[in-house]
Amino acid sequence: MASSIICQEHCQISGQAKIDILLVGDVTVGYLADTVQKLFANIAEVTITISDTKEAAALLDDCIFNMVLLKVPSSLSAEELEAIKLIRFGKKKNTHSLFVFIIPENFKGCISGHGMDIALTEPLTMEKMSNVVKYWTTCPSNTVKTENATGPEELGLPLQRSYSEHLGYFPTDLFACSESLRNGNGLELNASLSEFEKNKKISLLHSSKEKLRRERIKYCCEQLRTLLPYVKGRKNDAASVLEATVDYVKYIREKISPAVMAQITEALQSNMRFCKKQQTPIELSLPGTVMAQRENSVMSTYSPERGLQFLTNTCWNGCSTPDAESSLDEAVRVPSSSASENAIGDPYKTHISSAALSLNSLHTVRYYSKVTPSYDATAVTNQNISIHLPSAMPPVSKLLPRHCTSGLGQTCTTHPNCLQQFWAY
């Protein structure tokens, strides 16, 4: 037996919209009435009518509702199934109503979408019910009754199109698959989509792709039936045709020559239909990038004993002392091979002769003015001083203070810091 619940808020203006909602189902559907009232009370005056499944079809023929919520029982009898069919297909006066189906979890994926606009799977949550309100409010063509209007037909207002008309892919049976779904139609919706409908769109797209794949297999099997030699009494089902094709191809490969087989293979490879998309080759790093990575790895494990091993690959800064006769604007070039070999030993005992200094090396050596316990690339970069190469190479003795001309490998006791210009740490 149907019962009505009217939710009227105070301070409602005379033109406040009205929504007539029909709740259909067993006794448990009554618990939804309070939730539905709270959700729709902010946008309109809500009138809720509760009815069981058997009386709902007759009620829909006599009254007009803006929204129908049908809660499908977890176990359906033949009588209840027939009543649900009448509700879904016997909507004479409520063809433009919003139909929401609440489907039990054990019926998930079994009930088709014909006659429904939104399908909610149990267990119900506030988020799912809020999607119904959002779906209703975002549809620009929804129509509700007002106190000063007797009906949308009399006002000449366009009736709300059923969302199932927008979707356009619902079948005509409760537990049937959709013909339009197999055709892949109705993938675009004008109204905003809930999460359930987005998943349904993805499902439809997958179904259309699967249909296309099956059509291709069917077409190829028909072609194979034609290409295979005729054998009286041969089976024509797809599996038998494929097995016969495999035997036939094996027989042909044994008879043809390798040269002809190579031509066939080349022809198949040239056909892009049977080739996968080529992967983009990975680009190798530039030589400069590799060199920088090598230098960084060497410098990260720097030690004073290996300080001069990579001078030809590293720029070092130098500052002249007041006792020097000539400034460090004069450049020094060191051959990479000889400098690296001579620098392997102890820096304080290694002697570099003047003949070792030449203009043949392509690497500029810059000297650092003070000893650094652990190499700091940032500090060296911040103290970088450009050195311009002159046209002629001055003697090595001119680069040293007067009291240190005896040799590079000897320690100066008078000026202990002078040799620190020439040994990099």
UniProtKB/Swiss-Prot annotation:
Cellular localisation: Nucleus; Cytoplasm
Main location: nucleus
Gene Ontology MF annotations: DNA-binding transcription factor activity, RNA polymerase II-specific; protein heterodimerization activity; protein homodimerization activity; RNA polymerase II cis-regulatory region sequence-specific DNA binding; sequence-specific double-stranded DNA binding
PROSITE patterns recorded: BHLH
Record's GO cellular component terms: chromatin; cytoplasm; nucleus
Matches recorded under Gene3D superfamilies: Helix-loop-helix DNA-binding domain (4.10.280.10)
Glycoprotein recorded as keyword: no
Domain bHLH: residue ranges: 201-252
SMART domains documented for this protein: HLH
Keyword list, A-Z: Cytoplasm, Developmental protein, Differentiation, DNA-binding, Nucleus, Oogenesis, Spermatogenesis, Transcription, Transcription regulation
GO biological process: cell differentiation; oocyte differentiation; regulation of transcription by RNA polymerase II; spermatogenesis
Function (record text): Transcription regulator of both male and female germline differentiation. Suppresses genes involved in spermatogonial stem cells maintenance, and induces genes important for spermatogonial differentiation. Coordinates oocyte differentiation without affecting meiosis I.
Oligomer status and interactors: Forms both hetero- and homodimers with SOHLH1.
Protein name: Spermatogenesis- and oogenesis-specific basic helix-loop-helix-containing protein 2
